[in-house]
């Protein structure tokens, strides 16, 4: 039987997990040589992942090294996709903790490491990016040790091996200033340090922590066989999460991961990660077990969502111009499909038949879903993100996050002021060279819309990360966006002539010759109140000319929002209208008279 190792790679966002896996794939010659220089990451194969440079979904690949098969699971680093990270832990026998040699340990590192240590996994620490100038590998290694100690690691876990290297340049070494020519030292350490999966004899058992979706076959269950072995055509029982419901089923096909793809097999031994086809109606957390006497495994606990958002059909005057799928039935079917594979998501029906309340782990988590739907041809409108409030011991409680901000020293005062305005409290402050790291405890409500203000205030130099700490008593009202909106009073084409005349009233979000409709938010007013303006007036052409009266108009460029910025910007009485080709802000009530009546 082939030797086997199962490892997961965990790290903070952008510390180089996916790049490292790509190098492992190349070292084991899975790809043809000419595919190696494409410059893009092999694993981030979803357009959104490539554009944003982040991993959203966990992936499985395997490499063969010295006759041993290594199954590698690449996981996302963002806490918003924590649902993806948590469920994958059950499939691995050890973890590679990847840390940036310059940035050191970050909040997300702590979040993912805590999960792995609590399951008793032994880590191998990889200090990556040692080719960066001003990096401090030894200091970072001590930081990791302190972090593991503070998270209550056992003595065995603290006796970890450290490897230094640069995934981008493709080398790893036991000493940081002695580069080698390959990543073999890392692969050797994996073989020596990570235990082989335990082989347990008996009736088959497999927990389903992950799934894949194929438009040909439907849903495919992915997991690790923890006891016995599975065979093609075998009759099994599907034990549901509740531990009571049992469904009889049969395995049609079995596959194992080989390189970047999958390979059909007749039997899967204990300890191997495999994909099952032919099991109907399974959910994540269910167990596949013996046909005669089923013994389910305990299901996985997943963190609760912290934020909700209203999704509704597009009913603006420009409805149906761009999108293929515009009705509530389409949106409902798409959300139901997403629920099948997106663990941390929940959907409830809204106040009327056309709206749905979608719960998720944060603005990024929900905006990735909206962006994916938009690219598939859906039109929809989304409301302002709201945090989920719980009642604990008769007290109103809200989600509180730990936020870390790295910024140049001269901006630290501005950053502290921004955070404390939003009910944040400073818990720690470290200065390293000319950069300062500030740690805050801040309500989730306060983080909505904070990132764009933070970047503006620090000239784009600050980097901000946060993770959920728990629920704490309500901190009181937070002053959010101060300025009112400029709203179009007419439907038609926006003209440069009108925009120029109104520039002193505030910034615009539209360009000349764009189509606008009544009730669309087309700019930000300089004052606190909303203002209705008409940008559809063109210049009246007469025969009279006065010299010098026809100067060229100079119009400031419009402010363009990304989807997250738009969601964080809108007020309670506004929607973001999302279509495949456009994104507009609008008032929920388009007519000015209706808005006045509602505000009384």
Predicted feature residues:
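Conserved structured catalytic cores and adjacent interaction surfaces
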Residues: 2-19, 92, 102-114, 120-122, ...
């Amino acid at each position: 039987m082939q030797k086997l190792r199962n490892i997961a790679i965990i790290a903070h966002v952008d510390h180089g997990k996916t790049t490292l896996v790509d190098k492992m794939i190349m070292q084991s010659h899975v790809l043809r040589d000419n595919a190696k220089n494409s410059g893009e990451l092999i694993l981030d194969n979803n357009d959104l992942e490539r554009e944003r440079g982040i991993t959203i979904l966990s992936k499985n690949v395997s490499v063969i090294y010295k006759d041993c098969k290594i199954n590698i699971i690449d996981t996302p680093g963002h806490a918003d996709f924590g649902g993806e990270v948590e469920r994958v832990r059950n499939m691995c026998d050890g973890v590679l903790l990847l840390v940036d040699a310059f940035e050191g340990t970050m909040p997300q590192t702590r979040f993912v490491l805590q999960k792995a240590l609590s399951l008793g996994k032994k880590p191998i620490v990889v200090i990556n990016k040692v080719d960066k100038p001003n990096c401090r590998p030894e200091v970072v290694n001590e930081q990791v040790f302190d972090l593991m100690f503070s998270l209550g690691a056992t003595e065995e876990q603290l006796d970890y091996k450290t490897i230094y290297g640069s995934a981008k340049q493709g080398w790893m070494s036991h000493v940081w200033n002695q580069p080698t020519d390959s990543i073999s030292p890392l692969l050797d350490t994996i073989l020596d340090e990570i235990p082989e999966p335990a082989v347990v004899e008996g009736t088959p058992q497999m927990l389903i922590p992950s799934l894949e979706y194929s438009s040909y076959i439907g849903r495919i269950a992915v997991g690790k066989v923890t006891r016995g072995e599975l065979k093609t055509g075998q009759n099994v029982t599907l034990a549901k999460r509740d531990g009571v419901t049992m469904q009889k089923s049969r395995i049609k096909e079995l596959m194992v991961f080989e390189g970047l793809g999958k390979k059909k097999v007749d039997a899967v031994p204990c300890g191997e990660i495999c994909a099952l086809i032919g099991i109907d109606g399974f959910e994540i957390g269910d167990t596949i077990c013996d046909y005669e006497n089923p013994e389910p495994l305990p299901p996985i606990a997943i963190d609760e969502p912290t934020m909700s958002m209203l999704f509704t059909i597009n009913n603006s005057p420009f409805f149906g111009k761009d999108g293929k799928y515009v009705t509530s039935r389409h949106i409902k079917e798409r959300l139901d499909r997403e629920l099948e594979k997106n663990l941390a998501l929940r959907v409830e029906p809204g106040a009327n038949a056309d709206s749905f309340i979608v719960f998720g782990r944060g603005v990024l988590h929900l905006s990735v879903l909206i962006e994916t739907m938009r690219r598939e041809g859906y039109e929809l409108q989304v409301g302002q993100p709201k945090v989920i409030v719980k009642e604990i011991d008769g007290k109103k409680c809200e989600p509180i996050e730990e936020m870390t901000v790295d910024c140049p020293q001269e901006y630290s005062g501005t950053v502290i002021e921004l955070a404390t305005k939003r009910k944040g409290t400073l818990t720690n402050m470290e200065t390293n060279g000319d950069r300062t790291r500030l740690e805050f405890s801040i309500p989730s409500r306060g983080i909505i819309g904070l990132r764009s203000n933070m970047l503006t205030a620090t000239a784009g130099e600050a980097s901000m990360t946060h993770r959920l700490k728990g629920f704490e008593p309500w901190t009181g009202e937070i002053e959010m966006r101060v300025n009112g909106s400029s709203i179009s009073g007419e439907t038609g084409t926006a003209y440069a002539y009108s925009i120029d005349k109104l520039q002193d009233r505030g910034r615009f979000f539209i360009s000349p010759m764009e189509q606008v409709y009544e009730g669309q938010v087309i700019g930000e007013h300089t004052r606190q109140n909303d203002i209705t303006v008409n940008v559809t007036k063109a210049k009246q052409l007469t025969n009279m000319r006065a010299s010098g009266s026809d100067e060229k108009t100079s119009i400031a460029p419009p402010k363009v929002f990304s989807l997250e910025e738009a969601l964080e910007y809108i007020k309670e009485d506004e929607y973001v209208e999302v279509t495949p080709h456009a994104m507009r802000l609008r008032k929920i009530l388009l007519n000015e008279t209706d808005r006045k009546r509602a505000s009384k």
